[in-house]
Amino acid sequence: MKIHIKNGRVIDPKNNIDAKQDVFIAAGKIAGIGKAPEGFTANQTIDASNLIVCPGLVDLSARLREPGFEHKATLESEMQAAIAGGVTSLACPPDTDPVLDEPGLVEMLKHRAKQLNQAHVYPLGALTHQLAGKEITEMCELNEAGCVGFSQADIAIKDTQVLWRAMQYAATFGFTVWLRPEEPYLAKDGVAHDGEVAARLGLKGIPSAAETLAIASILRIAQETRSEEHT
């Protein structure tokens, strides 16, 4: 199968391309950009006028609903939605039900995604058991099962000693820690940005400092433990 995609805006950061060019595909692989390969005859031509042609996008925090939330959506439906939007790779936070804190659960998710054979799924293992912020998980075993990093999803670790040990352990093995910076006590019960609108609507506000203080703490611990963070 040979496909000619014409008139699209080609964006390819790796090769420093951002221009209106044609793309030529053969046997599922890009055979040429800008100029057709010798002897290329397309079986299908796609007019991509006013559209962007680019490598598959990566969603760094995609709730895939499985396991535990199939009443909302399924892994298959979420992956289909991702592909329809040009997202071909999905990083999955560990706040499923059950939490991704056991190798068997990670292997099950990876196997299910492989069976569906649509988007690539990259699980993030739980940084602490049950995301409770008390006991760090067996990161090495989770990594071997397929986790590409470790996260607390949207749940902050209140005990900085636990966070320190978790980041220190991750640094030892070169694992990346993904954290949402939020000072839990300042943000407690908040539902909106702390400001005029929240006050007018009678909503409990979250001050900006809830994020900046958490960022400062995370960066300081990262500096001391020499760990790699994504926030």
Segments predicted by a language model, with ranges:
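N-terminal metal-binding scaffold of metallo-dependent hydrolase/deaminase domains
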Residues: M1-T41
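Divalent metal-coordination and catalytic microenvironments
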Residues: G8, V23, G28, N50, ...
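Metal-associated gating/positioning segment near the N- to mid-region
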Residues: L51-A113
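Alpha-helix-loop-beta-strand connector modules within alpha/beta enzyme cores
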Residues: P103-H120, Q168-L179
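Histidine/acidic residue-rich metal-binding segments in metalloenzymes
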Residues: K134-E228
